[in-house]
Curated annotation (Swiss-Prot):
GO terms for cellular component: cytoplasm; cytosol. The keyword Cytoplasm applies. It comes from Drosophila melanogaster. Its main location: cytoplasm. Residues 357-377, 626-641, 966-987, 1036-1051 have a biased composition (Low complexity). Disruption phenotype: RNAi-mediated knockdown of the protein in the hematopoietic system and pericardial cells causes a decrease in macropinocytic uptake by pericardial cells. The modification Phosphoserine is found at residues 55, 638. Residues 14-37 have a biased composition (Gly residues). The lineage of its organism: Eukaryota, Metazoa, Ecdysozoa, Arthropoda, Hexapoda. Has been proposed to contain 7 WD repeats. This prediction could not be reproduced. Residues 1-41, 357-382, 620-644, 966-990, 1033-1054, 1071-1122 are annotated as: Disordered. This is Breast carcinoma-amplified sequence 3 homolog. Keywords: Cytoplasm, Phosphoprotein. GO terms for biological process: autophagy; macropinocytosis; response to starvation.
Length: 1122
């Protein structure tokens, strides 16, 4: 423990009226009395109520009253809400753990809202049905902080192997626990005696801000601050205080996750183990904050972020905030006006002070100078620095920034350096920060409140110096100062809400990966990829530039351009985007509202709340980015943020809970609680005691024409105040609900049925446990593109000649050249059917010697012709036409996975995708003028697959397969089946067993005169699929005139139109080889058989054609060809 860390007294029951079990009874319930009260207490239930929009006149009157702070009703200080927070880490309210236990369907977990009063505390649960239930309430003592501690993660969850010295949960039988700071009777009397101290430093009372994420204010005198230096832990199940930890300094806030409990003080932070409540880490290098929270922190699922008092260059991470950016013209003018007015005011104060002999303004100047002095010596403090540490493993007696060595215990457990990142976030002092639900995004706010920064942390296992912090966004609130008191993220990290001290909540659109926002990113139900299908298929980066090695930018090297994903920890880092708020929701200061507002029955003041949530403007709730009226309204309301009365406001994104307000005759086929929207509702709780649900809906920007809508089209946000709950304390005085709580209470009911315990205790039946875990599941995170780049009309296919002996580059390596080599032909009898089909000979299967591809132009390489109708010439060099389809990730419904993991109910969808792909390929071919010329010469001697299916069966059976050796193949390969009766049916084509060889035989289809026409090859690699359309006869060239003796085969008609890349599971055709792609264990192309006897004969044929082991070993291992 550091020498200047807070002193901790021995744990136990404190007897001076502070603890729970004290004899004076001023604690939070004493002994059996509290239990008897909780058993007899009936929880209050508050249903949702509609929110009525105020008229323009009423809104104007309310705005004047809010600004002038006049006509405020006098309220009892002990019933005033001093702080509020939403509890998101408790077992019952954690959105990452299951649904509601009593509701069916996709029901959201209940919201847990904690309200701190002048005397006592109150906890509400708002389940998915919309009826708020009071789950905890007491009126004794001043509570400045309260947290419902989540159940700690078990050792099995922390480490799969487990460790013998892993601490166990010492309070497993007493959970759930609450941690709170209770002031006792002395603090209560101090509050009642000096209620004027409720302001920020007003009167004689000091300020103790509570909640790093809420920042509520409790008016406690300085003399009573020592009473708030103890943290008590109480069991809600038994009502017994299990532990008390006392410190020498006042406790500001308590935060907790499933591995640690964090307690903050002025310039200090203490971290305790969540299972044993023992010391884990002490931080004494915090920078003091000038905001409402003297020591702001952010606690995520694993990391803890806090404001550091000095920047250590040895631990500084890459990235961060390079500066505040270029100020706008309006901000420049306002800053100049402020500087001029400030100078004139100081000059006037100095003149007045010289005449009167006083020193006015010295206090304010000294206060500001204490935070502005960032330079002046080697030990001077620097503002705006953030340090993120890992609090998962025990790291005791270690100061992260002072460099104190780790103890042997921490080092043996793999603690290492706990610092994850160390960077500069702002140039001013930090006043608030918050992690998102994933713990990777961090939003920070400085004391001016003009801009909020969003960072994405990219850790490195070596240390913080190799980590990177990406500055994604600059959320611009306005050009006037404001104090931030609360920050909230949506569960999918696409929206952020920032609340200021005047009660205004600003809603910003963001993305987890940065970049521009638009229709594509914020109107879908799910988070989309950073690159759209258009960018990925066209090879464009996020900035719209080509990512090819030829046209790379200056900041992108050649090696980086070849990588599919850039290393996020290496520069260059992304530049931040400036984002304006899409909505600004303002809360009134009191419940006293003009006529026409919705009444809150039994509430304090008996009034309602402003329905629109906007300070002025009536029904103008849906605010776009370019709304000048909203910006002007925001500027007027924030001018007095620093001097006005504070209003405690907190917010949270959650599913809607207003379905009870739907008309009684409305259909319940799809209840509101299960309807999915692109953005969740926003719940805002203000100090007047009313919780308001705002329904958010995205729409297209109004200034964009319909014909110009694209993925990057800006959006607007429509806001509707849907429902409200009056959760303030009643005048009649409700009964206390103190521990021990009943089994039907939301805080403890059905805890053992949740997913928070060890996985071994979840299922009684081993079979049920096995079924719940999906093993060996392959996740496809990227969808295929909707088109290929080469399919556009701007591409024309031409002949590509490769001179013999020339050097080939990477692009040439993708070409497959077909020449006449060792082949075995099959002569078809001249029958009526063969003449009609245009099939004269079929080249049989043969294997050549292994060659390094593509040095020989006369050898078939890469499995050319397998699974395709290969129509080629007998002489001449290969003339390939390249068609490259891109990387494997761009394949639309990858045939590898599609055929291997095909399901019966998905056949129609895959078939539709195959048909569309063939149609797209045919359309792309028709754009070529050379193919159009060839199409005009096409005669009617060639049939499509559908036409072949319509032929008479007896005509189809007239075609026989015979093997006739040629001069190029005088000695056929013994592995080649030469039995003329091997395949008796004409609509059955010999199967080709696919192995990992480089060179493969070619399957050729001849016309009725034995002339070669064209060939289409389909090559499937481990990570890429490419196609080549090849013509090897000058008379059948795509650009040359067609032969009169043998009509050419057009790329857009006949066989090629229907058989190009056909991956269906069952296709019937005559004389046409259909390609079917299977997994690695069944790599074979086949033609569907309807006769079982013919299938058996084909299997025998495959066994005879299987190569020897010696022959397989001689082949070089290269790309896998299908």
């Amino acid at each position: 423990m550091s020498a200047d860390s807070p002193r901790r007294h021995p744990s136990g029951v404190v007897g001076s009226g502070i603890g729970l079990g004290s004899g004076s009874g001023t604690g939070l319930g004493s002994g059996s009395t509290g239990g008897s009260k909780s058993g007899a207490a009936v929880p209050a239930i508050v249903p949702p109520q509609t929110v009525s929009d105020r008229s323009i006149l009423d809104s104007a009157i309310g705005f004047i009253n809010d600004v002038t702070l006049a006509n405020q009703p006098v309220q009892d200080p002990k019933d005033t809400i001093t702080w509020a927070r939403f509890e998101t880490c408790a077992d019952v309210s954690d959105p990452r753990f299951g649904d509601d236990w009593e509701l069916e369907g996709n029901a959201a977990p209940p919201l847990l809202l904690i309200l701190g009063y002048g005397l006592g505390v109150q906890v509400w649960a708002i389940p998915a049905n919309g009826e708020a239930v009071e789950v905890l309430s007491w009126r004794h003592g001043v509570v400045t902080a309260l947290r419902v501690l989540p159940t700690p993660a078990t050792a099995a969850a922390l480490d799969e192997n487990g460790r013998a010295d892993e601490p166990v949960d010492s309070f497993a039988e007493k959970r759930p626990l609450v941690a709170f700071v209770d002031g006792g009777s002395a603090a209560a009397s101090g509050l009642l005696a000096g209620s004027s101290g409720l302001g920020l430093g007003g009167g004689g009372g000091g300020v103790t801000t509570v909640g790093g994420s809420v920042g509520g204010v409790s008016g406690i005198g300085v003399s009573a601050s020592a009473q708030f230096s103890a943290v008590n832990f109480m069991s809600l199940k038994t009502g017994v205080q299990v532990k008390t930890i006392k410190f020498k300094n006042a406790v500001l806030d308590i935060q907790a996750n499933r591995s640690a409990v964090v307690i903050t003080f002025h310039e200090r932070i203490a971290v305790f183990d969540a299972r044993t409540l023992e010391d884990r880490l002490t931080i004494t290098t915090c920078y003091p904050s000038p905001g409402i929270n003297p020591n702001p922190i952010a606690l995520g699922p694993r990391w803890l972020a806090y404001a550091e008092h000095k920047l250590l260059h040895s631990k500084r991470s890459g990235g961060g905030c390079d500066g505040e950016g270029v100020p706008s013209y309006t901000a420049t003018v306002l800053n100049a006006a402020k500087s001029l007015s400030k100078g004139l005011r100081e000059f006037g104060e100095q003149v007045a002070a010289g005449l009167t002999g006083t020193t006015a303004g010295s206090g304010a100047s000294s206060k500001s100078s204490s935070f502005d002095s960032a330079s002046g010596g080697p030990d001077a403090k620097q503002s705006g620095v953030v340090t993120i540490i890992d609090v998962k493993h025990p790291v005791k007696d270690y100061s992260p920034t002072s460099g104190t060595p780790l103890s042997s215990t921490a080092g043996s457990q793999g603690g290492g350096d706990p610092i994850v990142a160390h960077f500069v976030a702002h140039s001013e002092a930090l006043v608030a920060m918050e992690f998102d639900s994933s713990g990777m995004l961090l939003l920070t706010a400085d004391r001016r409140g003009h801009d909020f920064h969003v960072f994405r942390v990219q850790p490195h296992p070596v240390g913080p110096s190799l980590a990177a912090v990406h500055h994604l966004y600059v959320l611009h609130r306005g050009d006037t100062s404001a104090k931030v008191q609360h920050i909230a993220f949506s569960l999918d990290s696409r929206w952020a809400a920032v609340s200021t001290l005047r009660g205004t909540t600003h809603v910003f659109p963001i993305t987890p990966y940065g970049g521009a926002m638009g229709v594509r990113t914020h109107t879908s139900l799910h988070v989309v990829n950073k690159l759209s299908r258009f960018h990925r298929s066209a090879g464009l980066g996020a900035d719209g530039r080509s990512s090819s090695p030829i046209s790379h930018s200056e900041s992108t090297t050649f090696v980086q351009s070849l990588q599919p994903y850039h290393n996020p920890t290496l520069p260059p880092y992304p530049r931040p985007s400036v984002v304006q708020p899409l909505a600004q929701l303002r809360q009134p200061f009191t419940l006293g509202s003009p006529p026409g507002s919705a009444g809150l029955g039994g509430g304090v003041g008996g009034g309602g709340v402003m329905g629109s949530g906007v300070s002025a403007g009536g029904h103008g709730v849906g605010v776009g980015v370019g709304s000048n009226s909203q910006r002007q309204r925001q500027r007027l309301s924030s001018l007095s943020d620093d001097s006005g009365k504070p209003l405690s406001v907190c917010s949270i994104f959650a599913k809607s809970r207003s379905w009870l307000l739907e008309p009684p005759m409305a259909t319940r086929e799809q209840p509101h609680r299960v309807q999915r929207k692109a953005v969740d509702s926003l719940f805002v709780m203000a100090g007047h005691g009313a919780l308001i649900q705002y329904d958010l809906d995205t729409k297209l920007a109004s200034h964009v024409a319909k014909e110009k809508i694209c993925d990057d089209t800006p959006i607007e946000l429509e806001v509707e105040a849907r429902a409200q709950w009056n959760l303030g304390r009643r005048k009649d005085g409700s009964q206390e609900i103190a521990p021990p709580l009943g089994l039907d209470n939301w805080l403890i009911k059905d805890r053992h049925a949740s997913l928070l315990l060890d996985s071994a205790n979840q299922f009684d039946d081993p079979d049920e446990r096995t079924e719940s875990w999906l093993a060996q599941v392959e996740i496809i995170t990227h969808a295929g593109p909707h088109r290929r780049l080469w399919m556009g009309p701007q591409f024309v296919f031409k002949n590509y000649n490769t001179p013999s002996g020339s050097n080939l580059n990477h692009v040439d390596a993708e070409a497959v050249e077909i020449g006449v080599s060792k082949t075995t032909t099959t002569t078809l009898p001249s029958t009526a059917a063969s003449s009609a089909l245009g099939l004269g000979t079929i080249i049989g299967k043969d294997r050549s010697s292994p060659l390094n591809m593509p040095l020989s132009a006369a050898t078939s390489v890469g499995g050319a012709g397998i699974g395709s109708s290969a129509v080629t010439g007998r002489s001449g060099a290969g003339v390939p036409v390249l068609i490259e389809s891109g990387s494997y990730s761009s394949i639309e419904q990858s045939p590898k996975l599609m055929d291997r993991f095909r399901h019966g109910h998905l056949d129609s969808d895959y078939g539709h995708g195959d048909t569309r792909l063939k149609e797209d390929l045919a359309d792309a071919m028709r754009e070529s003028p050379s193919t159009a010329a060839a199409r005009r010469e096409t005669t009617g001697n060639y049939f499509t697959t559908d036409q072949l299916d319509g032929l008479a069966l007896n005509n189809n059976n007239n075609i026989n397969n015979n093997i006739i050796p040629t001069k190029d193949n005088a000695s056929p390969n013994p592995n080649t089946n030469t039995n003329p009766n091997a395949i008796p049916s004409s609509n059955k084509v010999q199967k080709a067993e696919v192995t990992d060889a480089v060179d493969y035989p070619i399957r050729h289809s001849y016309g009725d005169h034995g002339e070669l026409s064209t060939v289409v090859n389909i090559e499937v690699f481990d990570d890429q699929l490419s196609m080549s359309s090849i013509s090897t006869n000058s008379r059948l060239s795509l650009e040359g005139p067609p032969s009169q003796s043998s009509p050419p085969l057009s790329l857009t008609n006949g066989l090629m139109d229907t058989n190009l890349m056909h991956f269906s599971e069952s296709v019937t055709g005559t004389g046409v080889a259909q390609a079917q792609v299977h997994g690695r264990g069944a790599n074979r192309f086949e033609v569907d058989d309807d006769d079982e006897e013919e299938e058996e004969e084909e299997e025998e044929l495959d066994e005879e054609a299987e190569p020897d082991d010696d022959e397989r070993e001689d082949r070089p291992l290269g790309r896998r060809n299908l």
